[in-house]
């Protein structure tokens, strides 16, 4: 499910943003789309178009390869265009071992260094693709970087990413009215808590994808066992709707917010939509069952703040 792009006045723009990609853009652009998000599987895609080349980076591999490749094909993406897959952490809903055999030979699977022991123990080793470890910024392509921040989540932690695209342009207000160089996107899920370091890491991104996992009231009223409730709400599990909103308000994203990992049992799109009414950023709510629309990174800042 998604929410139409909203201007500050509440009017909706409805571009045909769910259609296949079609021809490569003549000008550099970055597109983002969530294929699925939730406890049954998480996978998103970044598409980077520059100098006549289209490249894709998958963020998490929590859907089966067959399902993911089918969705990508429907979106106009080929397997050979997948250059990178980057993992936030290694929970079963964020990585499927079937990808070890099916990532293209030229692709890189990026795993944080602190996750490597668990990756080895669970047999996460690509057959054809390169296994790339990191603990500092990743250069995906010239002018495309991912800056990591490790946050608390269960035992091994989770990586929050700030993606920076030097070749893309955004359209904020500049003195001469020209497009400003550079665009950025934050991706944060399974966090557990909001810290000043997190806010600083994500501050001012053009697009912010962040989890809004549960409503505390619904969580308390649910039939879930107490240990599970404590795991989720205890500071190293997931963000509540209010915690997510606090993080968004602190980070001040320029144009668009994409909400991730909504609990089907302890949350609802209607609850989170109401919490974000009147905001000056566009809002998209991801789903476990269908992809979101395409979100262009860096293209709508001026329109959303006009």
Spans of features found by a protein language model:
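Metallo-beta-lactamase
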Residues: 16, 113-182
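Short beta->alpha connector loops
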Residues: 37-40, 63-65, 90-93, 152-155, ...
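Active-site metal-binding motif and surrounding structural segment of the metallo-beta-lactamase
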Residues: 55, 64-111, 206
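Active-site neighborhood of phospho(di)ester-bond hydrolases with catalytic His/Asp-centered motifs
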Residues: 57-62, 83-91, 109-113, 186-189, ...
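Short, surface-exposed amphipathic charged segments that create phosphate/polyanion-binding patches used
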Residues: 144-151, 295-306
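Cap/insert and terminal regions of metallo-dependent hydrolase folds
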Residues: 195-291
